Amino acid sequence: MNSRSFLIMAGLLLHAAHRADAQQDDGLYNQLHQASVEILVDRRLAGCGCIVDPDGIVLTAAHVIKNANRQIEVMSASLGRLQGSLLAMDAAHDLALLKLPKRKKPHPYLKLVKKPPAAGSTIYLYGSPLFRHDVMVPGLVARKQTTFEYVDGEYIEVVHIAGLVTRGFSGGPWVNREGELVGIQSSAMALGDAHQGLAFSAPLEAARQLLKSREWTKYATLGAGIEEIWEQQPGYLEKLPEDTSGLVIRVVHKGGAIDASGIAAGSIISAMDEQPVERRDELLRLLWRHQPGETVELEVSAADGTQKRTVPVRLGRLGPDPQTPIPRTKVVKKERQ
């Protein structure tokens, strides 16, 4: 084969591969279009979700619903506009389950992937950014392990995804090329109003567990926002003893566990139950071994690193009260069969 023939053959192969990828992406889009929904809360478009069960179970972000005392409707091209009822919530992973009315035939739905995608894998998000409907965007799994982010005054466990994700995508499905669900969009990293190119997704295993139990979860909280020592400004670090390690309490929620224990903002947590902590993830993973209402012992010192002492802290509960009445709303439009 001469060089001219080789180049022609290579070009044809590349063109065929491109067409195959385009067809696969179009099929993926159509699949997401059928199984994804928009969620109206008190008649306003609040976020997105996806059907994950043929009986009409919808998975979305907890912050889209916020609490059960709301009028919830679900809207999609395939279903029309229907009532929805809140089944369960996992505030620690920003997840909520909704239930759609029964219908004669199974609902279109997304299957959960069996194994989380590896770091660097391409995945896709579907939703309604800034009130624009039916948008699919790509992203990359940016971190192998889950981590914790401080969102709306509480820590949630998330997966980091590299991608520009705007408001309105909340609750939307992240899927792989095969259309299998790998996560639910939660929020994103921002400095002020500037997006930093890192999105936060609810972990796959948390979604799987919520679907299995269909019960409100119980996770403990300290009622505080913390920063790692090495995040602090040079002037602050210069005033600390060189051997100081731990986490700086930057925000104390009034009436929360830290506040009730008399620990002030600026204090430094160096251990929980005699186990040293230097990173947020270390502290929060230890914390979540406990149930709300249990007591832990925190080793804390003053803001200057002195006056180290051990303080008992009775843990609070993360998220809304599950005993709040669940609303029953009217069907606005009959579903499409």
Put a short name on every predicted segment.
Residues 42-47, 64-72, 106-107, 126-138, ...:
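Active-site loop architecture of trypsin-fold serine endopeptidases
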Residues 37-39, 49, 56, 60, ...:
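Terminal peptide-recognition signature
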Residues 164, 215-271, 275-286, 301, ...:
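PDZ/PDZ-like groove recognition
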Residues 8-15:
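Bacterial N-terminal signal peptides
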Residues 1-7:
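Bacterial N-terminal signal peptides that target proteins for export
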Residues 36, 42-46, 53-135, 158, ...:
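Conserved active-site neighborhood of the chymotrypsin/trypsin-like protease fold
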Residues 18-44:
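Protease-domain processing segments flanking chymotrypsin-fold serine proteases, especially trypsin-like
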Residues 23-29, 84, 107, 129, ...:
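C-terminal cap/linker of serine protease catalytic domains
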